[in-house]
A protein has these predicted regions:
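Active-site substrate-recognition segment that forms the wall
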Residues: 18-19, 45-46, 80-85, 202-329
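Helical element adjacent to the flavin cofactor pocket in flavoenzyme catalytic cores
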Residues: 137-194
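N-terminal Rossmann-like FAD-binding beta1-loop-alpha1 element of flavoenzymes
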Residues: 3-28
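Short beta-strand to alpha-helix junction loop
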Residues: 59, 91-99, 137-156, 282-287, ...
């Protein structure tokens, strides 16, 4: 019998399972689909400290950036190549430079390496950048990873330590006795355990309800364009200053902001969009057109580059823009790890570490209270 069943084999569930198993906890991971086949597969692989205002999420991001080295070193050798690239990020503005410079200053005060550079320096970093740029901030700690490779490698580490990963197993409810979790009910039967981790991403709200611990997690749709393979053309993660505002917005309407980056395969990823439209997965041509238009505004050469494909997915959105990490006080033995929206790849290592620290009862490496389950925005109490 496992100690813990993690429901959800995306990057957050995989990171929690890996950290728990590294601490000696017996873990089983289940997913109704294939591992890393949901939200994780629709991500860009962003590991960013540059897009977050000072506060709890930035603190988690800084900790997670440090934790990546620890986690990657624990991976089995045969799956250790997750296309990790510490390429750095470049945020550019084409208007008044003061807002971007002010934002960078507040981040530096919070411990981020944020370097305001001149347009000439920006063009040296990215020669194909539009000459309309008026100011830029360079973030050497921004990085990129292949999200599916990362999640599957984390799960491979769980298996290597004796844990189990089961695909195609749908969790239905949590079984309790004397007020504590005793197992998780699935379509394939009951898996007995002492604790259950709800890592269901944008579906965490519905599973939380089924488990007796409802939480307010909503899906937020995002779309990405993928170009045909190209010679080296975009060297860093490059995005416009509007990206920060879009990340932190709670507006349900469509928002787009430019983020452009290359992959090891030579393709260029173009994002990003955010829209709260439930689980509507229809391809919206007007969204793709807007992404392309804005990307050309940053990198004019993209106007002549063919788009090979597009993909999108649903990201787990919490109304106060903070992840939910920790025990559910209403159901002893039920834990949650969700609500990271589009930042789950970058926040996964610190999330796994924090949940594990709380689970085994050691002092956490950062203050867990901002991410607690029983906060008003998540459980709807005042």
């Amino acid at each position: 019998m496992p100690d813990v069943v993690v429901v959800g084999a995306g990057v957050i569930g995989a990171a929690c399972a890996e950290a728990l198993s590294a601490a000696g906890v017996d873990v089983t991971v289940i997913d109704r689909g294939t591992p890393a086949g949901g939200t994780t597969a629709s991500g860009e692989g962003n590991v960013l400290v540059s897009d977050k205002e000072p506060g709890p999420e930035l603190t988690l991001a800084i900790a997670s950036r440090r934790e990546f080295g620890v986690v990657l070193a624990r991976l089995p050798e045969q799956v250790a190549d997750v296309e990790w690239e510490a390429k750095g990020g470049l945020v550019v503005a084409k208007g008044e430079p003061e807002p971007l410079e002010k934002f960078a200053k507040t981040q530096r005060e919070a411990g981020v390496d944020a370097r305001v550079i001149s347009p000439a320096d920006a063009f040296e970093l990215e020669p194909l950048l539009t000459r309309a740029v008026t100011t830029a901030v360079y973030y050497p700690d921004d990085a990129q990873v292949q999200p599916v490779l990362l999640a599957t490698a984390l799960l491979a580490a769980v298996r290597a330590r004796g844990g189990e990963v089961r695909a195609g197993v749908t969790a239905i409810a949590v079984r309790q006795k004397d007020g504590r979790v005793t197992g998780v009910e699935t379509e394939a039967g009951v898996i007995e355990c002492d604790a259950v981790v709800n890592a269901c991403g944008p579906w965490a709200g519905s599973f939380g309800t089924a488990a007796g611990g409802p939480i307010e997690i909503l899906p937020r749709r995002g779309m990405i364009l993928v170009t045909a393979p190209l010679p080296e053309c975009v060297r860093h993660k490059v995005y416009d200053a509007d990206y920060v505002g879009a990340v932190g917005s709670g507006d349900a309407d469509l928002q787009t902001s430019t983020v452009v980056e290359s992959t090891r395969a030579g393709t260029v990823l173009i994002g990003s969009s955010r829209e709260r439209i439930g689980f509507d997965d229809a391809v919206k041509v007007h969204v793709l057109r807007e992404l392309a238009r804005k990307a050309v505004g940053i990198f004019p050469f993209l106007a002549d580059v063919p788009v090979m494909r597009t993909y999108g997915g649903f990201r787990p959105y919490a109304p106060d823009h903070l992840p939910v990490i920790g025990p559910d006080p209403r159901v002893p033995g039920l834990w949650h790890a969700t609500g990271h929206e589009g930042a789950g790849i970058g926040l996964a290592p610190a999330t796994g570490r924090l949940l594990t620290e709380l689970f085994i009862g050691v002092p956490p490496h950062l203050d867990p209270s901002p991410f607690r389950v029983d906060r008003p925005a998540v459980v709807g109490v005042s």
